[in-house]
Amino acid sequence: MKFGKLLKRQIEQSLPEWRDKFVSYKELKRIVASISGSPADEAAFVAALAADIDKIDSFFLEQEEEFVIRHRELQEAIKKAAEAAAEVAGIRREIVDFHGEMVLLLSYSSINYIGVGKILKKHDKRTGGALAAPVAEAVRERRHFFKTETVSRMVRECEAMMAEAAVLPAEAAPEALAAAAEHGIFRNTVAALLTMEDVRRGSSTHGRHSLPPLTLPDSDWLRSFQPPSPIPIQ
């Protein structure tokens, strides 16, 4: 499947409020196709690409900052609910949702990263230019959405939270996780991961100056739930 269709699928699997924050792949492709060699055409492409990268980076940073706060709040909530069985179910759902949203953000980072690389490759192929190398270097050095260590760490810590006896009692854990997995965010998270596997299998952008791959979570627990198709998140 072509990248444009996989990107469309990934956007559909994302949260509604995220869907206008992805790389404008179709529009950037149109701009590349219209480049005639004039400085004005090149400037228009560079401006459009820079605006898109700024959009992606700002959104990623905003979400990361929000997730850091939510992560801290959940840790506090777990401590308070350790002796209140009635609160455990609600916190369990919050943890599963939060975990899913963070994985969706990692997928968001990765697919936009690949999209930028593909657009740069198309640009250089059409113009004979060499824009990919400096842009890739700038992204690696200065852009937040390339640096996913904080979110990846919180994903791992969130999985540890789900394993804590105070939040997931051993006798109730399987049923609790199964119930939580029916929730839209969780199911769409797994579907998004499967889409990213398709994207990586079909990607041909790797090269000396291409954007290096990002790491997505490789969780046996998460991948044990593989729904046949995503469900809409209203």
Curated annotation (Swiss-Prot):
Coiled coil: none
Protein's UniProt name: SPX domain-containing protein 6
Function: May be involved in maintaining cellular Pi homeostasis when plants are exposed to an external change in Pi.
Pfam families the record matches: SPX
CDD domains the UniProt entry points to: SPX_AtSPX1_like
Location of the SPX domain: 1-137
Taxonomy, superkingdom: Eukaryota
Tissue expression as described in the entry: Predominantly expressed in roots and leaves.
InterPro entries recorded: SPX_dom (IPR004331), SPX_prot (IPR031142)
Induction details: Up-regulated during cold stress.
UniProt-listed GO biological process terms: cellular response to cold; cellular response to phosphate starvation
Region (Disordered): 202-234
Taxonomic source organism: Oryza sativa subsp. japonica
